[in-house]
Amino acid sequence: MNLIELDQALRKLRLSGMATVLEARLRQAQTERMAPIDLVSTLVADELLRRQDRLLERRHKQAGFRDPDRSLDTFDFEFNRKMNRALIHELATARFIAQREDALLLGPPGTGKSHLAQAIGRAAILQGYRVTYREAHTLIEAIADATLDGTRKDLLADLATVPLLIIDDLGMRKLPATAGEDLLELIMRRYERASTVLTSNRPVDDWGKLLGDTAAVTALLDRLLHHAHVLKCGPRSWRTKVHTDLRSEEATK
């Protein structure tokens, strides 16, 4: 079997990681006089690395992040120094997911809640967890649509089992009258079974008015807060800072 035939055989066996580097590794083996076992070990390591990279890429895509490049490395901790940096880094370890705990990120618009939630989600993927990201209004609308077309049971089953569900921007848009009950059912299915990160620009005392069902919200908060890490974001807003900087630039022209 020549090199071309070997490459084709490896790809048929779905060993594309080996096939991609085969020629280079064979040259390396000759140059370094590698033992056969060392060459095989190196090729296997190449295959495992490629599969891991493809798995991470697939999970990042499946997560559905709104801003897929968000990370803790790109978050400006100096802008809001009062934020609990230790808690943020603790959440990024994903230990709270292993312990089936939740996290609430609360604060005014523009204070970094969505950035941090997605950064925590990316960190969780790197540590082997599946993650689903949904903006609150699209999640609630999806559940309502699934109720109408008969797929509600399947949708809730999928959402209930993902190890980390991120519900972003609760309170940014008006929600349907069924939002409270739908969100409660989802959280009850996940309670002590999987982790949820929820961000909101509204204090929890306002959630009854927001979701239109005080009783459902009371039960919802009871479960969310039972094993929850609460991060207060702010008080300074990045959006306000940008507008202020722009006004300052205009004033100096």
State what each model feature region is.
Residues 4, 8-11, 20-24, 41-42, ...:
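Solvent-exposed alpha-helical segments within well-ordered globular domains of core cellular machineries
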Residues 164:
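Walker B motif beta-strand of ABC-family P-loop ATPases
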Residues 7, 16-68:
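Interdomain "pre-motor" coupling segment immediately N-terminal to P-loop NTPase/helicase cores
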Residues 85-161:
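Conserved P-loop
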Residues 12-15, 29-37, 62-65, 77-81, ...:
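Conserved phosphate/pyrophosphate-binding and hydrolysis machinery centered on Walker-type P-loop NTPases
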Residues 70-94:
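N-terminal pre-Walker A segment at the start of P-loop NTPase domains
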